[in-house]
From Swiss-Prot:
GO cellular component: plasma membrane
Keyword tags: Cell membrane, Membrane, Transmembrane, Transmembrane helix
Coiled-coil intervals, chain numbering: none
Keyword flag Transmembrane: yes
Chief place where the protein resides: membrane
InterPro entries hit by this protein: L-PG_synthase/AglD (IPR022791)
Domain of life: Bacteria
Compartments in which it is found: Cell membrane
Family assignment from sequence similarity: To E.coli YbhN.
Name recorded for this polypeptide: Uncharacterized protein slr0712
Topology class, membrane: Multi-pass membrane protein
Length: 322
């Protein structure tokens, strides 16, 4: 392995680690300034109806998330029951959202579960690729429209060649435009190195976009309802901030975007809200959107493995008695 290959291998993890440290430092500075007690008081002061609303949105959101695997199996012509594809979708997303390296962790969970139901390895690989593609297709579409229609202004100290996310939005939409032209058979698929554009029906592509759009709207709605007094900021204005923060968290590869996501949200929302209010809402959001589903999914996966182990033991003892 050459020196350049070694750098390419460790660079993403190193960048993610640096972003994590810097983000935690920024949050720690805010906590030191305002105090943990004030943040916890702000968390406890969130109206119960808002907490209930956020919890309801989380439940609906994770139901929507199961649609990725259901759509993947439909596209691949597999006849797995809805209960199984929904179980795979919930467990894989609830765990990968929190542990980070979503491509690796989510793929490993999908492989384990689908393999236990005798789904072939090539089909599993295609399902994994389809789910990951759906995520990015939806993100680029929703992000592109949001950044073009309601462009978020970027702080001057970043010294970027543009002052708003407008160019990012147009870039996102250009990529999606090419994708839809390919799936609509208006231009031929092409290859970039070993990668070839997938042959997905146009209707399925639209379903990918619709599914992911609902997913992102619901996920952002969880944090939005936890913020006090929405007269400060409209939902469309907040949505752009949420998307930008999530993209930063995804790029960092930090588990659940921990620290990176919060830092971006904190920085962009503090002109509208106090830091204590934002940190309190972020704490509630992480508990509701990440920790509760993570706990439920971990228990569900553990129960599944236990049942599988018992079933295999019964089958083994039955074959030996024969």
């Amino acid at each position: 392995m050459t020196a350049w290959q070694k750098i390419q291998k460790i660079a993403p993890a190193a960048i993610g680690a640096c972003l994590f440290v810097l983000s935690i430092g920024a949050i720690n500075s805010e906590l030191h300034h305002y105090g943990w007690q004030n943040v916890l008081a702000s968390f406890q002061g969130i109206v119960k109806t808002r907490l209930a609303g956020a919890f309801a949105l989380m439940l609906i959101n994770y139901i929507i998330l199961t649609g990725y695997d259901t759509l993947a199996m439909f596209y691949l012509g597999q006849s797995l029951p809805l209960t199984k594809t929904s179980f795979v979708g919930f467990v894989s997303y609830a765990i990968s959202n929190s542990v980070g390296l979503a491509l690796l962790s989510g793929s490993a969970i999908r492989y384990r579960l689908y393999q236990s139901w005798q789904v072939s390895a090539p089909i599993i690989a295609q399902a994994i690729a389809f789910c990951n593609l759906s995520f990015w297709v939806g993100l680029l579409t929703v992000g592109g429209i949001t950044f073009v229609v309601d462009p978020l202004q970027l702080p001057a100290f970043l010294h970027l060649p543009f002052l708003s996310v407008h160019p990012i939005g147009f870039t996102f939409l250009a990529i999606i435009g090419i994708y839809l032209l390919i799936t609509g058979n208006l231009i031929k698929p092409f290859k970039i190195g070993q990668w070839q554009t997938p042959k997905i029906p146009f209707a399925v592509s639209l379903a990918q976009i619709g599914l992911t759009a609902v997913d992102w709207i619901l996920a952002s709605g969880i944090l939005y309802v936890l913020l006090p007094g929405h007269h400060h900021l409209s939902f469309p204005g907040f949505f752009g901030i949420y998307l930008l923060a999530q993209v930063a968290g995804i790029i960092s590869n930090v588990p659940g975007g921990l620290g990176v996501f919060e830092t971006v949200v904190l920085f962009l929302l503090t002109p509208k809200y106090s830091s204590v209010q934002v940190l309190g809402a972020l704490l509630a959001y992480r508990v509701i959107y990440y920790w509760i589903p993570l706990g439920s999914a971990s228990l569900s996966l553990g129960a599944f493995e236990l049942l599988q182990h018992r079933r295999e033991r019964r089958q083994k003892s039955g074959s030996e008695s024969e």
